Amino acid sequence: EFREDEQITFDGKKNEIINGYPDWVYEEEFGFNKGFYWSPKGDRIAYYKFDESKVKEFQMAMYGGLYPDQNTFKYPKAGEANSVTSVYVYDLNAMTSKRVDAGKKKDQYIPRIKWTKNNDKLCIMRMNRQQNQLDFLVTDLSTSQPFELKADVFFTEKSDTYLEVGDDLTFLADGSSFIVLSQRDGF
């Protein structure tokens, strides 16, 4: 079934709110260039929302013409404010978005979101700013929560130093098992 193009967010604003596309940190540090993902049945879209209104602006001269242009963009430096990141799920049938509660901390990363094999379950990876703890959360969209979806931690990876985030999370067909590359040692 084909439908007309449909706008699903209305609050995007240059250098303030980004929907469905990564901000600078997520593109450069977590290596992705897309911020939305279709559910297995294609009836929902999970997407990132970045509020970069508190991130300081950076100006860069862009050379290439007779005179350089100035490009201004949000660029957080070490210790400065990052974008506040949240995840939403848009339901194409209900034509509504719900925010996923990925924790109350504002100073955290959500380096990956991924649908499980179950169309009603979305996995969110949540990482602390020190990047030494990675929590795997799941939210169940079949619940009838009106505006916000609760997410629960089902696995945590910790390190004394640093954790690398990859795309190696695989959900198995049984709906409850998964495989992930762990950086733990001592086995």
Predicted features along the sequence, with ranges:
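Long hydrophobic segments that form regular secondary structure
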Residues: D91-N128, S142
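A conserved hydrophobic secondary-structure block that centers on an alpha-helix together
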Residues: E1-N15, K105-R112
